[in-house]
Every structure is written in structure tokens, then in C-alpha cells.
């Protein structure tokens, strides 16, 4: 009996070992299967060598790599006009530290450079002030051989009269100044610049803090050229503008959309991108091209004469404006795009992104919203009827005086 018991125990032990072996074999197969399944997911996870932003975006490699000795880059740019992850990607990919100062008006940037602000490598002048800065020797000619990224641009945005041959500038973004209003609160929407002088709009308006644009639209209401140098016409514009300014609740070039979204202003004048973003969050916001014609403009990159890190500046221009990087502007600051490569990259691209308000979407949907909106995709008749602000030469002090006196009244 004892022997039989021992035999039974031995048989039971052998059976347990067999079961254990089968279990281990099964677990090994499961482990291999999971690893194989995980392989597909791993392809979507950035490799250890990939450069990934704090938001989880995997940065593209440079399309136009170059040797750069400088370790920093100093930008002097418009407020809220460069996506943070665009800067972060450039820093990760290049190893160059980006320092950013901001301004709210071309005149602010011009004054600082004129006063000897020579620490900057790149600035963002709007078209009309480029010729003035060139004339005063504040900018250096660009070496186009170092800018292969120029191939990315729609030729409609190159070779403007303010910079023939793009000797000094490379396009950044374009757009319009036009009328904006909230359809839920404005019973009689304005159709012309002249309408903004109506008493019913007093205390409800927001205007850009932009002297040339505001004086320019005032000149248009009088039937004059936005670039007039005639002192008598400018005096007349000054008197008319003095009637308008007390009715303006807020002058803001940093974030005019904020007041429109919050309901602190019901109408006024603003830029393309600000109107588009306001409308995305508040659909009742409408954008109207005035009967006298909108103000047309283009912002550009330019290099100050004594830029201390020009090699880093060229690296920034080539990287930030390649198509798989500059698409970020469609998300954050959707103005009119001179960069055709970024539009081509975005079209039909199902990459998951967040919009400017943090809502999940795809890059293709951002493109569709851009291309289907008459705000960002400016209609041909609005361009034909529009006006570009130019350098007025010796008449500039007259414009400055008007703005200072009228706003200070």
C-alpha cells in the first residue's frame, strides 16, 4: 500500500511537471504574440533618437541641413505670431537656443532698430516699412544661395515693389485689415469703413493699434489714397479721425480676438487671422471687406544689418518654413499662406492634431477650414479692390504726428 501510494505520488508529480511545462510554453507563445502585436504600435512611438516636443510632437528632420557655428538665435517678432512647438522643434533639431522679444507695431520695431538695437538676427517687418528700413541701411541683403526654402513659396507673394527680387525679405504671412462684427449684437452691420463713424457704434468698437492702417482707412472714407503725401488731405483725415477715436472702446494689436470673443467689443477692424480664430470660437463673428477696399499687407522675415548670428538665422528660415513644419501656422495663427509647401503638406493629411482651441482634429480639416473661408482665402475681388500701404518717405512724420495727437486727445 505504501509502495502504491509512492507510485501514485510519482505519477502525480510527473503530471504536474507536464502541466507546468505546457503552461510555460503557452506563456512564452503569448509573450511572443504580444511583442509582435506591440511592434505595430511601436512604429507610431518616436524612437529614442527622435526629437519630441513637450506636447509629444515628433519634430521633422531638416529638409535643408547646414553647418551652423552659432549656438543662439535672437528673434524680434510680432506678439503671439510663432507657434511654441515650432521654436521647440528648431531648438531640438539644431541645438540652437532661440531668444524671442516681441512687439505690437512696426513702428515699435523700427524705433528700436533705429536706436541701435543690433542684437537681433531676424525681424518681421510688414511690407511698407521694409523699403524705409532698406533706405536707412537697417537691413542686410539676404544670400539667396543659403535659402533653398524659397522654392516653397507661391510666386504671387514674391517680388513685390517694396522689395524687388526679394533681396532683403522672405515672405512670412499675408492678410487683410477689414471690418469685423458680431451678428448676434449688431443689428445693422457695417458695410463700409465710413459706416464705423455712425453714432450707434460708439463705445462698442475695437481697432488695431496700427497708425498707418487706421489713418489709411480714414483717408479712404474721404476718397484719398492711403499713401497720400498731401498735407491738406492729411489734415482733413486728422480731423475726421478725431471724430472716430472717442467712439473706439479699445485699441489692441496683441489679441483683438479676445475682446470679440468675450463680448467686450461688438465690432471694429482687425486682421485676417484674429477674425478667423474669433469666428472659430464664436460663429456669430463675421468679417466684411469694406466697399472702399480692405487694407492688404504681407509680413516678412528680414535680417538686421549687424545680425550677430546670421548662420543661425538662415538655419531658422530654412527649417521653420519647410512644409512639414510651417503647417503649424494653420493651427495657431491662420493668416493667408504664401508658403505653398505647407498647404500641400496639410491637404488631405490625416495626422491627428489639436486646433487653436485645443480640440482634436486632423491637419486635413485645418486645411479645409482655411481654404473654404473667405477670411483666410481672400476672394479675388477683395484683392483687386484692396489697397497696399507703402513707404511715404518724408511724409512719415506727418502720419506720426496725426496718430500721436489724435490718440492723445
What does each of the following model-derived ranges do?
Residues 372-409:
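Conserved C-terminal helix/tail region of periplasmic/extracytoplasmic solute-binding proteins
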Residues 73-84, 108, 119-120, 124-264:
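Extracytoplasmic ligand-binding site segments that recognize negatively charged/polar headgroups
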Residues 1-72:
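Short, low-complexity disordered leader/linker segments with a strong preference
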Residues 304-378:
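Mature extracytoplasmic/periplasmic domains
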Residues 152, 234-243, 281-305:
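Periplasmic-binding protein-like
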Residues 129-132, 261, 267-284:
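A ligand-binding cleft/hinge motif common to bilobed small-molecule-binding domains
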Residues 48-132:
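Early extracytoplasmic/lumenal segment of secretory-pathway proteins
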Residues 178-185, 220-223, 297-312, 328-331:
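A bilobed periplasmic-binding-protein/Venus flytrap-type ligand-binding module shared by bacterial periplasmic
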Amino acid at each position: 500500500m505504501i509502495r502504491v501510494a509512492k507510485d501514485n505520488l510519482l505519477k502525480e508529480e510527473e503530471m504536474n511537471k507536464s502541466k507546468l511545462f505546457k503552461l510555460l510554453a503557452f506563456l512564452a507563445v503569448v509573450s511572443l504574440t504580444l511583442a509582435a502585436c506591440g511592434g505595430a504600435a511601436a512604429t507610431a512611438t518616436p524612437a529614442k533618437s527622435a526629437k519630441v516636443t513637450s506636447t509629444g510632437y515628433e519634430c521633422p528632420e531638416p529638409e535643408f541641413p547646414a553647418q551652423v557655428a552659432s549656438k543662439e538665435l535672437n528673434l524680434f517678432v510680432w506678439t503671439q505670431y510663432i507657434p511654441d512647438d515650432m521654436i521647440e522643434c528648431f531648438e531640438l533639431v539644431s541645438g540652437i537656443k532661440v531668444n524671442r522679444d516681441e512687439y505690437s507695431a512696426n513702428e515699435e520695431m523700427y524705433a528700436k532698430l533705429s536706436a541701435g538695437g543690433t542684437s537681433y538676427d531676424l525681424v518681421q517687418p510688414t511690407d511698407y516699412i521694409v523699403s524705409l528700413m532698406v533706405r536707412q541701411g537697417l537691413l542686410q541683403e539676404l544670400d539667396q544661395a543659403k535659402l533653398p526654402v524659397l522654392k516653397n513659396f507661391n510666386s504671387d507673394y514674391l517680388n513685390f515693389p517694396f522689395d524687388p527680387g526679394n533681396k532683403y525679405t522672405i515672405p512670412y504671412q499675408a492678410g487683410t485689415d477689414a471690418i469685423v462684427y458680431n451678428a448676434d449684437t449688431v443689428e445693422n452691420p457695417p458695410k463700409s469703413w465710413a459706416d464705423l463713424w455712425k453714432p450707434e457704434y460708439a463705445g462698442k468698437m475695437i481697432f488695431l493699434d496700427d497708425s498707418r492702417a487706421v489713418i489709411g482707412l480714414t483717408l479712404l472714407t474721404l476718397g484719398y489714397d492711403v499713401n497720400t503725401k498731401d498735407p491738406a488731405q492729411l489734415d482733413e483725415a486728422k480731423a475726421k479721425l478725431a471724430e472716430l477715436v472717442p467712439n473706439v472702446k479699445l485699441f489692441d494689436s496683441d489679441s483683438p480676438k479676445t475682446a470679440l470673443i468675450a463680448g467686450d467689443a461688438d465690432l471694429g477692424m482687425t486682421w485676417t487671422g484674429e477674425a478667423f480664430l474669433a469666428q472659430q470660437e464664436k460663429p456669430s463673428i463675421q468679417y466684411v471687406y469694406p466697399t472702399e477696399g480692405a487694407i492688404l499687407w504681407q509680413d516678412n522675415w528680414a535680417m538686421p544689418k549687424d545680425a550677430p548670428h546670421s548662420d543661425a538665422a538662415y538655419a531658422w528660415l530654412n527649417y521653420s518654413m519647410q512644409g512639414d513644419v510651417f503647417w503649424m501656422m494653420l493651427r495657431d495663427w491662420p493668416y493667408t499662406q504664401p508658403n505653398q509647401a505647407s498647404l500641400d503638406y496639410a491637404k488631405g493629411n490625416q495626422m491627428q492634431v489639436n486646433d487653436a482651441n485645443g480640440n482634436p482634429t486632423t491637419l486635413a480639416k485645418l486645411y479645409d477650414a482655411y481654404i473654404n473661408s473667405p477670411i483666410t482665402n481672400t476672394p479675388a475681388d477683395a484683392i483687386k479692390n484692396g489697397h497696399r500701404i507703402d513707404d511715404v518717405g518724408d511724409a512719415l512724420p506727418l502720419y506720426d504726428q496725426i496718430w500721436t495727437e489724435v490718440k492723445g486727445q
